[in-house]
Amino acid sequence: METLSQDSLLECQICFNYYSPRRRPKLLDCKHTCCSVCLQQMRTSQKDVRCPWCRGITKLPPGFSVAQLPDDPEVLAVIAIPHASEHTPVFIKLPSNGCYMLPLPISKERALLPGDMGCRLLPGSQQKSVTVVTVPAEQRPLQGGAPQEAVEEEPDRRGVAKSSTWSGVCTVILVACVLVFLLGIVLHNMSCISKRFTVISCG
């Protein structure tokens, strides 16, 4: 099998969707991998699954579903979260500069796939990619409190918000001045047009 980048290992090369509990990475007899949804669609009219790349056939016994094909262990190794403990804390950096910890239970029998736990917390059908960070025990927050570094950075964040507001006010004032200047030029030209038949120059 050809060497793929780590990004391409995370997604099905047919539909380009990331692997998830609904789209498990299934290994064919020819050692190619694609998601269970694509394999199910390819199998709708056939008893066997034909590989879309090498045309190799993976025979499925009667009553055997695509879900029963083995998962690709290489792909699971790339997308699996390390089993440090029963509950590995996950820190998610949000656009609002907040950092929240989600304790995710990890089953040792199966790997945690993207979208398995964290994405269920999002409203609607939104999906966000999150980066799982292993945090040393000495840097973990105590009893759900914020880490010490986050507490120290809080005054800096307020300063950034104040400077951002101030720069916005300055931008509005600058735009208003430019508009007044342009309005002055237009009014001056209009007064010159009304006096064009006189001898006085509007220079």
Curated annotation (Swiss-Prot):
A zinc finger (RING-type) spans 12-55. The chain crosses the membrane at residues 167-187. SUPFAM superfamilies: RING/U-box (SSF57850). It holds the Pfam family zf-RING_5. The keyword Iron-sulfur does not apply. It comes from the Eukaryota. GO terms for biological process: apoptotic process; cellular response to amino acid starvation; negative regulation of TORC1 signaling; positive regulation of autophagy; protein K48-linked ubiquitination; protein K63-linked ubiquitination; protein monoubiquitination. Ubiquitinated. Autoubiquitinated in vitro, leading to its degradation by the proteasome. GO terms for molecular function: small GTPase binding; ubiquitin protein ligase activity; ubiquitin-protein transferase activity; zinc ion binding. It catalyses: S-ubiquitinyl-[E2 ubiquitin-conjugating enzyme]-L-cysteine + [acceptor protein]-L-lysine = [E2 ubiquitin-conjugating enzyme]-L-cysteine + N(6)-ubiquitinyl-[acceptor protein]-L-lysine. Its EC number is 2.3.2.27. CDD domains: RING-HC_RNF152. It is a single-pass membrane protein. One of its GO terms (cellular component) is lysosomal membrane. Its main location: membrane. PROSITE patterns: ZF_RING_2. Pathway: Protein modification; protein ubiquitination. InterPro entries: RING_RNF152, RNF152_C, Znf_RING, Znf_RING/FYVE/PHD. Residues 106-165 are annotated as: Necessary for interaction with RRAGA. Keywords: Apoptosis, Lysosome, Membrane, Metal-binding, Transferase, Transmembrane, Transmembrane helix, Ubl conjugation, Ubl conjugation pathway, Zinc, Zinc-finger. It is found in: Lysosome membrane. E3 ubiquitin-protein ligase that acts as a negative regulator of mTORC1 signaling by mediating ubiquitination of RagA/RRAGA and RHEB. Catalyzes 'Lys-63'-linked polyubiquitination of RagA/RRAGA in response to amino acid starvation, thereby regulating mTORC1 signaling. Also mediates monoubiquitination of RHEB, promoting its association with the TSC-TBC complex and subsequent inhibition. Also mediates 'Lys-48'-linked polyubiquitination of target proteins and their subsequent targeting to the proteasome for degradation. Induces apoptosis when overexpressed. Belongs to the RNF152 family. Interacts with RRAGA (inactive GDP-bound form); stimulated by amino acid starvation. This is E3 ubiquitin-protein ligase RNF152. It comes from Ailuropoda melanoleuca (Giant panda).
